[in-house]
């Protein structure tokens, strides 16, 4: 019986560890920096954001075309048929005359150049597009920051689920050993059946937890693969000497000031407000005239030629003015609508400032409390392990019941999972704090990546 139980225990351990690493048999570990580099290449959502940015950059050249000369080539061929009563030329009544028909064919080709002299609408439109290009740059920076957060969250979620799966596996193995011992003692009449039932219940619960985390691990791996593409490598894991790092600067006021000047959502809202103001000026430009210099050079030929024909080259130059004096009230209504949009953007800017202020304070306090939480979780894990070992020893001496041992053991593994969760929560809170002040870049990923090492053994999970 003991040999069979030991065989089952070893088989369970090996099968679960093999399952955890089934999708990552490669020798070299995939670290956080490499994962983000792959996400930049393989994530279609990020590629769409980059392409949208590139398309937005082209708008400036399109808008500048309204301020530059335009040259057009035109041509036409016309045929004119005319009937004339010759009685009029001879001084006779019309009824005595005869109709004479004639036809004339005209061919013309012309080259026309236009240069805006005063196009207030085009100039204001150009300024609006310049603002939109700046807004597009901030949008891409914000999307990049969110992309970094997505990749980091997906990466560390895989590590979290790997660590939890290993912890629950260890608990399941320990409880399996306890259950084996209890069954043996039950046969000898040394323990009550209720204690065996309690041990079995704890074992079934641990097994359910391990299965649940295995499912969560698969889902986490799929989420990461969705961002970076399929991968076969092990993920680099947190070093055993991982330590809490206090945020720099160390006071909340400094972080709040950084957020007010560098938070990307605030910068986005400010540019959106300027864009709305530019849009209002574009609508107001419709009240002004449009002045253009126009020059034309062409060639005209009429056949058959007559004394009245003007065959040959021709050219002309002049100034053309267009002024829309009334458009059914559309212009005034458009101006008022643009004014409302400016007020809307001002309200959105105020909301962005308030939200950034709240977010940075919340993120800073989370990182600050993570220090106390990590220390407390670590102390609880160490002390609960000591209590668990002591309970097992006291059980052997008859001072504790098996229920006491199982409770202490459950508390020890619960403290371990709490500590694991606290570590990964801290890492994500650090990234969120940096994002709240617009400073989450590849540099910050590299600093965090320094705490990762290649997968070494199941205990490293």
Model-identified regions with their sequence ranges:
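Amphipathic alpha-helical coiled-coil segments
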Residues: 48-63, 143, 147-168, 177, ...
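Bacterial N-terminal signal peptides that target proteins for export
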Residues: 5-16
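Periplasmic alpha-helical coiled-coil/stalk elements that build and connect Gram-negative outer-membrane
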Residues: 146-260, 366, 370, 411-413, ...
């Amino acid at each position: 019986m003991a040999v069979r139980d030991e065989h089952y225990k070893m088989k369970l351990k090996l099968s679960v560890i093999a399952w955890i690493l089934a999708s990552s048999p490669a020798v070299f570990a995939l670290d956080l920096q490499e994962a983000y580099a792959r996400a930049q290449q393989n994530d279609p959502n990020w590629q769409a954001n980059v392409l949208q940015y590139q398309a937005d950059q082209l708008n400036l050249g399109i808008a500048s075309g309204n301020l530059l000369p335009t040259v057009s080539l035109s041509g036409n061929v016309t045929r004119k048929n005319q009937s004339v009563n010759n009685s009029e030329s001879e001084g006779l009544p019309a009824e005595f005359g005869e109709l004479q028909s004639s036809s004339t064919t005209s061919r013309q080709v012309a080259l026309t150049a236009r240069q805006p002299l005063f196009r207030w609408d085009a100039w204001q439109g150009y300024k609006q597009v310049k603002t939109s290009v700046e807004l597009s740059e901030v949008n891409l920076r914000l999307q990049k920051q969110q992309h970094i957060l997505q990749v980091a969250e997906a990466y560390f979620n895989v590590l979290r689920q790997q660590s939890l799966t290993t912890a629950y596996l260890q608990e399941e193995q320990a409880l399996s050993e306890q259950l084996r011992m209890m069954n043996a003692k039950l046969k000898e009449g040394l323990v009550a059946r209720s204690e065996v039932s309690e041990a079995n219940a704890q074992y079934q619960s641990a097994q359910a937890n391990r299965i649940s985390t295995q499912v969560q691990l698969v889902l986490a791996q799929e989420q990461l693969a969705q961002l970076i593409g399929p991968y076969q490598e092990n993920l680099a894991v947190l070093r055993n000497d991982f330590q809490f790092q206090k945020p720099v600067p160390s006071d909340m006021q400094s972080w709040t000031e950084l957020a007010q000047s560098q938070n990307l959502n605030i910068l986005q809202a400010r540019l959106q407000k300027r864009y709305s103001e530019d849009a209002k000026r574009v609508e107001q430009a419709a009240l002004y005239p449009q002045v253009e210099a126009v020059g034309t050079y062409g060639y005209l030929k009429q056949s058959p030629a007559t004394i009245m024909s003007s065959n040959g080259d021709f050219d002309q130059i002049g100034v053309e003015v267009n002024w829309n004096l009334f458009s059914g009230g559309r212009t005034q209504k458009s101006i008022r609508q643009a004014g409302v949009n400016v007020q809307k953007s001002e309200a959105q800017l105020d909301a962005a400032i308030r939200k950034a202020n709240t977010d940075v304070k919340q993120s800073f306090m989370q990182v600050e409390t993570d220090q106390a939480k990590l220390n407390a979780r670590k102390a609880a894990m160490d002390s609960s392990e000591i209590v668990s070992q002591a309970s097992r020893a006291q059980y052997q001496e008859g001072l504790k019941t098996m229920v006491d041992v199982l409770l202490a053991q459950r508390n020890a593994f619960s403290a371990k999972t709490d500590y694991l969760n606290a570590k990964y929560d801290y890492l994500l809170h650090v990234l969120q704090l940096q994002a709240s002040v617009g400073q989450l870049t590849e540099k910050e990923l590299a600093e965090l990546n320094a705490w990762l090492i290649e997968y070494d053994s199941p205990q490293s999970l």
